[in-house]
Amino acid sequence: MLKNLSHVNIWVHDQDEALAFYTDKLGLELRDDVTLPEMGNFRWLTVGLPGQPDAALTLMAIPGPPVFDADTRKKIEELTAKGAAGGLFFSTDDCRATYEELKSRGVDFTEEPSERPYGIDAAFRDPSGNHIRMVQTT
């Protein structure tokens, strides 16, 4: 049987920029940063929340040929930039306080904290355009 969800991948336009955003601004920690020469210098870059060692977010560069042809790569870049290539949800104990903290670190929010039927949430994007929500459930 399946045991845990260990990795979630998101597309990023610039892995170094994404790493700085997720670690410096959001407070995640670096887990892996490995270059694999046998795979065309593919960079395996993961971050995760402190205290959750079994779950990681993989910051994936959008590959070109032979993985994706140029047109497919361009479409993925465009969808990611629009926030339409998936998204992330983080939970928080205090959405409003976390909003203020992240805003002070330079996170650009697309939605301020607001009351929802399930709790309080707010939204922002990473530098690549990925849509991220943080939720305080009630």
Show where each model-derived region lies.
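Alpha-helix N-cap/helix-start capping motif
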Residues: 16, 95-96
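Beta-rich, blade/repeat-based domains predominating
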Residues: 83-84
